[in-house]
């Protein structure tokens, strides 16, 4: 990913859970979750799914290309019943399956990436902000030697 006037660039690499192909030739990127659906997950996982969608629509050489991706979402299994097989090598989950749509907003994702790459292009990091979650993560990582 490159932006004019920004020296830093990036590429996206990762492992998505699954994709769907629709009858009209479009695709969806799906992330599986074994938990109770939570509206906060939309924002939390939305950027990850947007990154997968961007990478699939703009692949590098010899990489999988799926385009256009028109839907993103989380497919939840909210386990209610868990049964262990007699040999304890098999587990069966029972529960409710829920689909949560995540809006595909490529312009928001690219705006985020432009901000990240602008920041990475600075000669020195800016002073940390008390309201910056990334700054808090960085401080915590340094505190624990990461």
Where are these regions (language model features)?
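A generic fold-level signal
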Residues: 11-13, 44, 127
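Catalytic cores of nuclease domains that cleave nucleic-acid phosphodiester backbones
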Residues: 1-29, 35-37, 61-70
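Metal-dependent nuclease catalytic regions and adjoining charged, substrate-binding loops involved
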Residues: 58-146
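Active-site metal-coordination segments of metallo-dependent hydrolases
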Residues: 38-46
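An active-site-proximal "capping" alpha-helix that borders the catalytic cofactor pocket
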Residues: 45-59
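Well-ordered beta-strand positions in beta-sheet-rich domains
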Residues: 13-15, 46, 99
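Short acidic/polar capping segments at secondary-structure boundaries
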Residues: 34-36, 79-80
